[in-house]
């Protein structure tokens, strides 16, 4: 099968969707011998879509682990120009505001639709909304009469990003839609998409590297003592709850003053706010915090193995792949009662849930794990078993492939 994946970023770009498409693409090549090509941008993250000053990857073609990758240059200046007008239009709920939001978010990629339309694929699959390349993939597929599968990564609680009627019109025109959780699937169906064309596939993780890394080895690598470590490992963004975690830790340190805090993620614009919050903390607390920016995928087993409690108090996620990575390292997790997260974490069985932006509840959950380390380890091990049974990349890639084959079949019947 000749597959074209269209996505906003690809390794060494960092992000959940970036990793998902990378690992699914590699598994399709290695497991099934499929011919997989990825069309993507030359940006390291989504901020590059509207900020022309950020560093870029080299545009052009390369091959990574058997996957052919073509990086297209992004025109950031147009998106940058409408960043302020779209904020005003959104605030005033003007009728054209969702189009301005789409343009401001980008990525604007000259020539992408034409390249998709001309590419000799059996199937075209694109990830993720609300970004512009999704429409290029759909229109390119329709113009070349090819089946199109859309993978949205929708988290409905993000009104700015996902309260856009054009997203659901596009999904209705696709051959199949892939969702990360049943929560997302139900929401898309509520927007009028036919249930028989919505499939839950989930996301995955490679458990083996996490098995081979000891906690002692990982803590030593990052310069931690043997005291417990609370960790956040993921994208630094406004909705991810890093600021809430820092506020919660001031309460934790009143009871457990020796606990260390690891904050690891890509150095985004929000990282400056995180640094400002840390700067305002008392010196005794600052010494307990380690910031670790722009880590590679290869470092993840070390990062997750170094923590004793994984706190990821994000306000909305389409899944939250970081929970799987923590479980792969047998760590207990804390998430928020928001979006798809309660469909991922079984509360009291493999993790705990708290209210979004509630620093008191988050602190109490962290303290509960620190006071009951044997119980915390039990929850982490239950999470690991869940990963092994349902969320390996091998299993997830098989689900993607089954949908691709069915999409090709259905498209043939319809034509």
Role assignments for model-derived ranges:
Residues 52-58, 211-224:
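A short helix/loop element that forms part of the nucleotide-sugar donor recognition site in Leloir-type
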Residues 350, 361, 368, 375-390, ...:
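A short, well-ordered alpha-helix in the C-terminal region of glycosyltransferases
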Residues 273-295:
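Nucleotide-activated donor-binding/catalytic signature segment of Leloir-type glycosyltransferases, i.e.
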Residues 294-295, 302-307:
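Short alpha-helical donor nucleotide-sugar binding micro-motif in glycosyltransferases
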Residues 4, 224-240, 246-249, 262-264:
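Conserved donor-binding/catalytic core segment of Leloir-type glycosyltransferases
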Residues 315:
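Aromatic "clamp/platform" in nucleotide-sugar-dependent glycosyltransferases that forms part
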Residues 44-45, 205, 233, 260-275:
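Glycosyltransferase donor-sugar binding loop
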Residues 332-335, 345:
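Short hydrophobic beta-strand element within catalytic cores of glycosyltransferases
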């Amino acid at each position: 099968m000749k597959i074209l994946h269209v996505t906003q970023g690809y390794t060494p770009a960092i992000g959940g969707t970036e990793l998902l498409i990378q690992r699914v693409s590699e598994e399709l090549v290695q497991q099934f011998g499929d011919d997989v090509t990825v069309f993507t941008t030359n940006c390291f993250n989504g901020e590059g879509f509207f900020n022309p000053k950020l560093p870029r990857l080299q545009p052009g073609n390369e091959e990574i682990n058997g996957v052919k990758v073509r990086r297209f240059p992004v025109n950031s200046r147009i998106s940058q120009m409408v960043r302020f007008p779209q904020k005003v239009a959104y605030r005033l709920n003007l009728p054209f505001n969702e189009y301005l939001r789409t343009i401001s978010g980008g990525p604007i990629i000259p020539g992408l639709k034409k390249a998709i339309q001309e590419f000799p694929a059996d199937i075209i699959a694109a990830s993720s909304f609300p970004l512009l390349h999704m429409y290029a993939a759909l229109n390119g597929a329709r113009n070349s009469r090819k089946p199109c599968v859309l993978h949205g990564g929708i988290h409905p609680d993000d009104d700015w990003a996902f309260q856009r009627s054009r997203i659901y019109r596009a999904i209705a025109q696709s051959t199949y839609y892939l969702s990360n959780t049943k929560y997302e699937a139900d929401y898309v169906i509520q927007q009028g998409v036919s249930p028989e064309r919505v499939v839950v596939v989930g996301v995955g993780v490679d458990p083996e590297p996490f098995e081979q890394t000891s906690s002692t080895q990982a803590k030593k690598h990052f310069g931690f003592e043997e005291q417990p470590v609370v960790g956040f490992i993921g994208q630094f963004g406004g909705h991810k709850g890093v600021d809430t975690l820092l506020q919660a830790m001031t309460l934790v340190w009143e009871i457990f003053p020796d606990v260390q805090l690891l904050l690891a993620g890509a150095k985004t614009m929000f990282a400056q706010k995180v640094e400002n919050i840390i700067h305002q903390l008392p010196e005794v607390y600052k010494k307990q915090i380690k910031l670790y920016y722009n880590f590679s995928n290869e470092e993840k087993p070390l990062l997750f193995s170094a923590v004793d409690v994984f706190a990821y108090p994000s306000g909305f996620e389409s899944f939250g792949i970081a929970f799987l990575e923590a479980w792969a390292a047998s760590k207990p997790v804390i998430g928020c009662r928001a979006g798809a997260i309660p469909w991922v974490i079984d509360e009291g069985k493999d993790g705990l849930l708290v209210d979004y932006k509630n620093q008191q509840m988050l602190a109490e959950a962290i303290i509960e794990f620190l006071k009951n380390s044997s119980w915390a380890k039990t929850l982490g091990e239950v999470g690991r078993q869940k990963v092994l049974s349902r969320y390996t990349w091998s299993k997830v890639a098989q689900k993607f492939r089954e949908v691709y084959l069915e999409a090709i079949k259905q498209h043939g019947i319809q034509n």
